[in-house]
Amino acid sequence: MSRQTAIEVRRGRAAKRGHASRRARAASRRTLGALVALGVVALIAILIASEVNHAVSKLGLPLTNAEVIRKQAAEKHLDPALIAAVIYAESKFAPQRSSAGAEGLMQILPETAYFIAHLSGGSRFTESDLATPSINVAYGSYYLRYLLGHYDGNEMLAVAAYNAGLANVDRWVARARADGGHLTVAAIPFPETRAYVERVLSAQQDYRSTYPRQLGLR
């Protein structure tokens, strides 16, 4: 092989290596670009799924009169999510008069409303007032605060009493204490009240996570 031929061979090999190197770099860039694109698509999919899940959650977890709830929660020193959860359990934010005569968002019986009016020093109360959301939530929130005070802040007992009445819950608590323990959700004798308490306490957490801004939690 002549010197010139050897030089040409080396140049050819170098050129091939250069072409191969450029092809490898181009392939690497294409792979990187594809990975970045896939990452962007995956991120968009996650964001869309999150928004869809949030929207679906809101469909199954309605909220109206948020301003009224925030106001009453602040005035009565209550968790606004608890008020919302009680409304959800009582009327699902679509109030109708019950067969027992309970009215409004928080399904307050007229006799309970008169009791609350007496406790709070209210005057000029009429039963038709219970159909007004702001009044209904004010009365229901006052009653929740009263029950929480009666049970030293125990939300489970207060919610149980909202459903079953003070006399029943007081009797259950006394019985549990006589046995050396305390009343638990599982030990609530009334199946309806047991399910009600579970529903309210679960919905309370759901409202906190789904509507933190609307309920003034952040």
Q: Residues of each region from the PLM?
A:
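Hydrophobic membrane-insertion alpha-helices, especially the h-region
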Residues: L32-S50
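Short juxtamembrane and helix-loop transition motifs at transmembrane-helix boundaries
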Residues: R22, I44, P62-L63
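Feature targets compositionally biased, intrinsically disordered low-complexity regions
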Residues: R11, R17, L32, D179-G180, ...
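Extended, non-globular alpha-helical segments
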Residues: R23-V36, E103
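Catalytic glycan-binding domains that act on GlcNAc-containing polysaccharides
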Residues: I48-R218
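N-terminal Lys/Arg-rich, disordered targeting/topogenic segments
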Residues: M1-R29
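Intrinsic-disorder/low-complexity peptide segments enriched for small residues
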Residues: M1-T5, V36, L215
